[in-house]
């Protein structure tokens, strides 16, 4: 309820700031590099990474420097890793859910998700977002039977340099509330 009140009270400023941010903030490309493959030696491990621009690695030039590359560097001396990166800049939780419907049913040992920033920019309430997260995790469980699922939290959007206040503050409040909901959901899974 409070998010509706905050959002409604700030609508004139948010609309202006949102337009200015969208117009003036450069769009970074997703990094080049393999999104599907095998790397390393040792015990077999299958990895699926799902999400938005953070999962895709936006902000670096090559996948070797992104989340996927960092994980492969750390684990490839002990594991033969079959990896699959299914992440797209701008994706919301709904879009991630739709994208995994196109994947074959198979087993992944580990699944990492990173999604939520774009849900915030669409003003998805924390309650609606966590409901979508629960739906996502049920689909992941049923379709891929992972041994481990790792949920990345939403970054502190109030600290994004491209966002002016009060837009940064409002998005930061959404992020904090969503991370709290996500933490409670994850704690119930163990």
Spell out what each predicted region is.
Residues 7, 14, 18, 73, ...:
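Charged/polar, solvent-exposed surface patches and flexible loops
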Residues 19, 90-92, 156:
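Residue-level detector of flexible, active-site-proximal loop/helix-junction positions
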Residues 39-40, 76, 142:
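Generic structural signal for beta-strand residues in well-ordered domains
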Residues 43, 79, 145:
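Residue-level signal for beta-strand positions within conserved beta-sheet cores that form or flank
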Residues 1-48, 106:
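N-terminal secretory targeting modules
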């Amino acid at each position: 309820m409070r998010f509706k009140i905050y959002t409604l009270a700030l609508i004139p400023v948010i609309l202006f700031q949102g337009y200015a941010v969208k117009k003036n903030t450069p769009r970074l490309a997703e990094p080049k590099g393999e999104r599907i493959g095998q790397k390393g030696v040792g015990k077999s491990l299958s990895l699926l990474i799902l999400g938005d621009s953070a999962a895709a690695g936006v902000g670096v030039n090559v996948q070797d420097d992104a989340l996927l590359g960092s994980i492969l560097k750390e684990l490839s001396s002990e594991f033969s890793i079959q990896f699959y990166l299914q992440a797209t800049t701008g994706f919301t939780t709904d879009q991630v859910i739709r994208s995994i419907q196109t994947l074959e049913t198979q087993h992944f040992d580990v699944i990492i998700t990173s999604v939520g920033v774009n849900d915030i920019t669409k003003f998805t309430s924390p309650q609606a977002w966590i409901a979508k997260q629960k739906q996502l995790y049920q689909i992941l469980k049923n379709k891929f039977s992972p041994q481990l699922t790792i949920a990345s939290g939403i970054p502190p959007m109030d600290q994004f340099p491209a966002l002016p206040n009060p837009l940064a503050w409002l998005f930061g409040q959404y992020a904090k509330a969503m991370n709290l909901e996500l933490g409670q959901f994850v704690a119930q899974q163990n």
